């Protein structure tokens, strides 16, 4: 047996400068060792294949892969396997590396002594019995590619197609080579790192004295927690190294000075002890009443994210938006999700990332219908919930009439009136429901009053009493193209639904086909020579109704505007449409890729490629607010920093000049038109 090792991670990170080429390094080492072809010939074939595969992402990516091939062919080290390994008993073994005089200590896993035997896996544990049972009986066998062995009886409790939420928390995939480390002494407690995190793997916690005392010894705290009334609390930022995808967005978002950064990326193995801290905080730290409103970037991140550890790409913009929405409204949220990236990272069986609040047990109710009828599906959910709620509202009204006829105390009539007076105020109504139902439950338990049957009927419908937040999620392929007819119908209906469009300007999930959201000059499938016509103005179409709330957002350009638009849209009594700019792997962002996702949003706004605004029909005074300044950046420099545009210049230089100029002019006209519209909408 010949045993070789190679530090592909180090080569990719330090020598090539692109962590994604680890596989290319390993491939080259394999061909160098296998002798299937002469190594020079193999290198030639590999470079040719790399050029063909990666030219669409630009010359830099091709050059990086070529360098990885060259280095990988020579960077492996042979390890002489000691005969003593056959009967090894020690936890460490001395290993002689070929070409080196010294030896190194290598960990010998205990199960090597019984090679071939799979160690038993400890059963999943947790406070939610239904979820734990689901993970042990279904998630783990399926994850091990053993799903065919499951009997039909294993799905008996899921015959209606429902699955318990939150199974993704049990995966702990540990796929990131580098993860964040938090330096408490440098932290300014802004929570921007958590705000941009696509996978909810970095979270702020405010611990009281008891929680802090019980925390693992390796828990780090700032010297004090900033904020009025927080003097007795301790602030920590907990990180899950086994759930992190290593995207580095948190590091890029940190506003501290580079020489005193509060977060930096380090090797995963150095941070594994922080998993215990994260798990403790998630399971045991209560949500506090803090002086930071959830309408602020800082305050919103103390809310538990109800979308966590999804399978989306590292750096994904879509999950950053969706995670934030669940923090704000997740406990009373319904989601109808179009097929596409957001349905894949949002609902892939068996481990779904949407979860429930630890204290209330409530979370988003998620469903996926077809690609083309998602808007109609969401409207159906809204109308069904509306009908059920109105039925129980009437029962409360009838009971109130009966209470008044019986001359019951003001406390009893007050609890019903408190509910009826807050029907359109989601937060106040949720509190009123809890108060009313607790009183009704007490009366039902006594069982002596003639109103008990009516009270019992109301309690049976408790889940439908509070105001719900209905959301329709989907990408631009759905919203601009395949599902547009349904979306238009739903927006025109006037019903109180919220639509979130993740605009990647391409069919991301199916491999990069052009959509009506794709822009002039963009190269995609079905637009190999660059798209010649402009991007559909979905926002203007929706605004033309006059009664639809419409916003365009870009989280990396303005976190506060993103938060404000989402809050306003949900509070608006009527249909709302939010279009979020979402840089994607398909864009081929140069020099860093998706680790620059949030920065790319900022550049897009500065260059005038993307405009941020809010159109609120219910606003007093100006109804259209432009939140982005007049463009100051270089439009063509921005688009050519992305391979989806730069490869047009490589393939069709003259056509690219024509289309890029056309695209820049269209962007200027779009902003000028927006300014004129803002003037028209002033009272």
Listing of model-derived features with the role each one plays in the protein:
Residues 9-12, 48-50, 208, 243, ...:
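Acidic, glycine-rich active-site loops and adjacent beta-strand->loop/helix elements
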Residues 61-63, 184, 314, 477-481, ...:
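Active-site glycine- and acidic-residue-rich loops that bind
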Residues 22-27, 344, 478-486, 509-510:
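Short glycine/serine/threonine-rich phosphate/pyrophosphate-binding segments
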Residues 2-53:
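Short alpha-helices
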Residues 452, 458, 466-472, 481-496, ...:
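Glycine-rich ThDP/TPP pyrophosphate-binding loop and its adjacent helix/strand module
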Residues 1-8, 210-229, 354-356, 507-520, ...:
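Flexible glycine/proline-rich, aromatic-decorated loop/lid segments
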Residues 4-6, 204, 265, 335-338, ...:
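General beta-strand structural signal in soluble alpha/beta enzymes
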Residues 55-244, 251-334, 338-469, 522, ...:
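Ferredoxin-type iron-sulfur electron-transfer modules and their immediate structural context
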């Amino acid at each position: 047996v010949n045993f070789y090792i190679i530090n592909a991670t180090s080569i990719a990170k330090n020598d090539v400068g692109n962590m994604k080429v680890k596989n290319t390094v390993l491939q080259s080492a394999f061909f160098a060792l296998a002798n299937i072809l002469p190594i020079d010939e193999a290198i030639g074939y590999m470079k040719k294949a790399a050029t063909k595969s990666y030219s669409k992402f630009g010359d830099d990516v091709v050059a990086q892969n070529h360098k990885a091939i060259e280095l990988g062919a020579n960077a492996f080290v042979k390890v002489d396997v000691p005969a003593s390994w056959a009967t090894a008993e020690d936890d460490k073994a001395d290993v002689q590396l070929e070409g080196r005089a010294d030896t190194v200590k290598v960990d010998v896993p205990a199960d090597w002594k019984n090679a071939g035997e799979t160690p038993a896996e400890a059963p999943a544990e947790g406070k939610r019995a239904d979820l734990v049972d689901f993970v042990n009986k279904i998630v783990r066998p399926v994850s091990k590619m053993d799903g065919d062995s499951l009997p039909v009886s294993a799905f008996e409790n899921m015959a209606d197609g429902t699955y318990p939420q939150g199974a993704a928390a049990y995966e702990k995939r540990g796929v990131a080579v580098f993860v964040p480390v938090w330096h408490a002494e440098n932290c300014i407690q802004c929570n921007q790192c958590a705000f941009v995190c696509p996978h909810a793997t970095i979270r702020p916690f405010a611990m009281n004295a008891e929680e802090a005392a019980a925390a693992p010894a390796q828990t780090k705290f700032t010297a004090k927690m900033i904020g009025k009334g927080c003097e007795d609390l301790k602030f920590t930022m907990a990180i899950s190294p086994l759930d992190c995808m290593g995207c580095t967005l948190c590091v890029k978002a940190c506003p501290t000075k580079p020489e005193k950064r509060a977060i930096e990326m380090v090797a995963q193995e150095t941070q594994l002890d922080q998993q215990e801290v994260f798990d403790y905080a998630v399971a045991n730290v209560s949500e506090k009443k803090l002086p930071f409103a959830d309408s602020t970037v800082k305050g919103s991140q103390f809310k538990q994210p109800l979308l966590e550890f999804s399978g989306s790409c590292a750096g994904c913009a879509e999950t950053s938006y969706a995670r934030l929405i669940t923090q704000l409204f997740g406990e009373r949220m319904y989601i109808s999700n179009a097929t596409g990236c957001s349905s894949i990272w949002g609902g892939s069986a068996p481990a779904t990332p949407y979860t429930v609040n630890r204290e209330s047990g409530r979370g988003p109710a998620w469903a996926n219908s077809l690609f083309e009828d998602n808007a109609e599906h969401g409207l159906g959910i809204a109308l069904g919930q509306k009908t059920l709620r109105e039925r129980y509202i009437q029962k409360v009204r009838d009971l109130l009439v009966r209470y008044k006829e019986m001359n019951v105390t003001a406390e009893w009539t007050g609890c019903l009136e408190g509910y009826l007076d807050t029907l359109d105020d989601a937060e106040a109504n949720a509190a009123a429901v809890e108060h009313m139902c607790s009183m009704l439950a007490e009366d039902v338990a006594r069982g002596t009053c003639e109103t008990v049957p009516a009270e019992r009927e109301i309690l049976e419908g408790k889940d439908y009493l509070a105001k719900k937040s209905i959301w329709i999620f989907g990408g631009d392929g759905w919203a601009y193209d395949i599902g547009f007819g349904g979306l238009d119908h739903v927006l025109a209906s006037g019903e109180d639904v919220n639509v979130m469009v993740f605009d990647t300007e391409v069919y991301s999930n199916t491999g990069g086909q052009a959509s009506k959201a794709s822009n002039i000059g963009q190269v995609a499938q079905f637009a190999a020579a660059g798209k010649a016509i402009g991007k559909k103005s979905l926002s203007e179409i929706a605004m033309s109704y006059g009664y639809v709330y419409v916003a365009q957002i870009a989280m990396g350009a303005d976190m506060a505007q993103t938060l404000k638009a989402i809050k306003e849209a949900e509070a608006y009594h009527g249909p709302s449409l939010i279009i979020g700019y979402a840089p994607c792997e398909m864009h081929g962002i140069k020099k860093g890729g998706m680790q620059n996702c949030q920065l790319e949003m900022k550049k897009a706004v500065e260059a005038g490629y993307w405009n941020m605004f809010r159109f609120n029909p219910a606003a007093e005074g100006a109804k259209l607010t432009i939140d982005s300044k007049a463009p100051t950046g270089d439009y063509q420099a921005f688009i050519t920093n992305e391979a989806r545009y730069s490869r047009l210049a490589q393939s069709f230089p003259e056509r690219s000049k024509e289309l890029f100029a056309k695209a820049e002019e269209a962007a200027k006209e779009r902003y000028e038109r927006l300014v004129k519209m803002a003037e028209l909408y002033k009272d």
